[in-house]
Amino acid sequence: MESINWNTRSVREELAAVKRAAPFVYGLTNYVAANLSANVLLAVGAAPAIGAAADWPARFGAGAGALWINTAALMSSGADTLRTAARAASETGTRWVLDPVATGAGAPEYDAIVQELLAFRPSVIRGNASELIALAGGTAAGKGVDTTASSDSALAYIGDLARRSGAVVAVSGPIDYVTDGIDTLAIAGGDARLTRVTGAGCALGALIAALLAQRGAALAAAAAAHAIYAIAAERAADARGTGSFAVRFVDELSLLDPGE
């Protein structure tokens, strides 16, 4: 297993590519996370659009540089909307991220919709340990949208899920792990207050999509997104409280210089 961080050359190259290209990234996410997700994308130089207005799911799912679907978008959009966007991406080769929020938390109808989306072959699946263990067929009930399991305990499950789905799978925790079912990358660091900022994990899915839009290796893109998140959180760590930390975190994302 290899460890990477902000000082890894490939991580900085991934961010530099996004800043040069300013990719159009389309997302279906929940209204709780939409604002932070958009601001994270803007901070790294991407161009976001979020929501299911009219024919956006079909048109933008097919035409964006990349797509991310946070399944808590079901709060305000129907399952058919998520399927439409995922199908459009799958049929046109648009790379996309699946974030199966709260999977395994005790809502079987919701979980069934999440499982259906796997048929549209996401490029990356990201979530917390409880969500990914459940998606892989294990048992690790989350506490609502929060995890009750460690990222270490999810390692075997995410490897199996990656091999079965063909997706890169990324689990967040004190140490993040990203795997394609063969190779696994570990990313340490960050700040525990990210877990106290609404939508921070959801916005990570958006950042992964921005890096995926550059058409490089999905494993490298997903791992780089975690490393970028970690360094921004570390640099925001001297913020006084959770609210100022959230603002400072976006500031630090916007100030990251791949050439530093």
Swiss-Prot record:
<comment type="pathway">
    <text>Cofactor biosynthesis; thiamine diphosphate biosynthesis; 4-methyl-5-(2-phosphoethyl)-thiazole from 5-(2-hydroxyethyl)-4-methylthiazole: step 1/1.</text>
</comment>
<dbReference type="GO" id="GO:0005524">
    <property type="term" value="F:ATP binding"/>
</dbReference>
<dbReference type="InterPro" id="IPR029056">
    <property type="entry name" value="Ribokinase-like"/>
</dbReference>
<dbReference type="GO" id="GO:0009229">
    <property type="term" value="P:thiamine diphosphate biosynthetic process"/>
</dbReference>
<dbReference type="GO" id="GO:0009228">
    <property type="term" value="P:thiamine biosynthetic process"/>
</dbReference>
<keyword id="KW-0547">Nucleotide-binding</keyword>
<protein>
    <recommendedName>
        <fullName>Hydroxyethylthiazole kinase</fullName>
        <ecNumber>2.7.1.50</ecNumber>
    </recommendedName>
</protein>
<dbReference type="InterPro" id="IPR000417">
    <property type="entry name" value="Hyethyz_kinase"/>
</dbReference>
<keyword id="KW-0418">Kinase</keyword>
<keyword id="KW-0808">Transferase</keyword>
<comment type="function">
    <text>Catalyzes the phosphorylation of the hydroxyl group of 4-methyl-5-beta-hydroxyethylthiazole (THZ).</text>
</comment>
<dbReference type="GO" id="GO:0000287">
    <property type="term" value="F:magnesium ion binding"/>
</dbReference>
<dbReference type="Pfam" id="PF02110">
    <property type="entry name" value="HK"/>
</dbReference>
<keyword id="KW-0460">Magnesium</keyword>
<feature type="binding site">
    <location>
        <position position="126"/>
    </location>
    <ligand>
        <name>ATP</name>
    </ligand>
</feature>
<keyword id="KW-0479">Metal-binding</keyword>
<keyword id="KW-0067">ATP-binding</keyword>
<dbReference type="GO" id="GO:0004417">
    <property type="term" value="F:hydroxyethylthiazole kinase activity"/>
</dbReference>
<feature type="binding site">
    <location>
        <position position="199"/>
    </location>
    <ligand>
        <name>substrate</name>
    </ligand>
</feature>
<comment type="similarity">
    <text>Belongs to the Thz kinase family.</text>
</comment>
<keyword id="KW-0784">Thiamine biosynthesis</keyword>
<feature type="binding site">
    <location>
        <position position="172"/>
    </location>
    <ligand>
        <name>ATP</name>
    </ligand>
</feature>
